[in-house]
Amino acid sequence: MKSIGCDIIKVERFKSFLENKKKMERFFTHKEIENFKLKGGSIIESLAGKFAAKESLIKALTPLLQYKIRYSLKDIEVIKSLKGNAKFCLHNEIEKFAIKMNLKLYLTISHEKEYAIAFVMVEN
């Protein structure tokens, strides 16, 4: 194991995202936003969980960085694998870094009414 990252977030913080499209587009890709629309009643929990996942990955990668890289949270996309579990799809400089370092990323997300939490493990 190389590194870990964890983030917990109050789900309530993301209610404003539903009313503010620009705010949502600042942190989430178009693909993620489309997937949220399919969620139905659990959109806010899903938003919070995916945001926590992105923050967890940053926390896990930061100790491994040997140089500064430019990224936005939109460069970290949280998608579903064929098995149905959440996984990362990275873009731009953060993707290049992960490839260069030969990193394997493991992600778990959980949410329960008030809170969402994500845990990331990084290995190579």
Curated annotation (Swiss-Prot):
GO biological process: fatty acid biosynthetic process
One Gene Ontology cellular component annotation held by this UniProt entry: cytoplasm
Key words of the record: Cytoplasm, Fatty acid biosynthesis, Fatty acid metabolism, Lipid biosynthesis, Lipid metabolism, Magnesium, Metal-binding, Transferase
Catalytic activities: apo-[ACP] + CoA = holo-[ACP] + adenosine 3',5'-bisphosphate + H(+)
Main location per the UniProt record: cytoplasm
Single GO molecular function: holo-[acyl-carrier-protein] synthase activity
Enzyme's top EC category: transferase
Source organism, top-level taxon: Bacteria
Subcellular location: Cytoplasm
SUPFAM superfamilies: 4'-phosphopantetheinyl transferase (SSF56214)
Binding site for Mg(2+): 7, 55
Cofactor: Mg(2+)
E.C. code: 2.7.8.7
Gene3D superfamilies, sorted: 4'-phosphopantetheinyl transferase domain (3.90.470.20)
One Pfam family, short name: ACPS
UniProt cross-references to InterPro entries, sorted A to Z: 4-PPantetheinyl_Trfase_dom, 4-PPantetheinyl_Trfase_dom_sf, ACPS, Ppantetheine-prot_Trfase_dom
NCBIfam families: acpS, pantethn_trn
Family: Belongs to the P-Pant transferase superfamily. AcpS family.
Known role: Transfers the 4'-phosphopantetheine moiety from coenzyme A to a Ser of acyl-carrier-protein.
Protein name in the entry: Holo-[acyl-carrier-protein] synthase
Taxonomic source organism: Borreliella afzelii (strain PKo)
Annotated gene: acpS
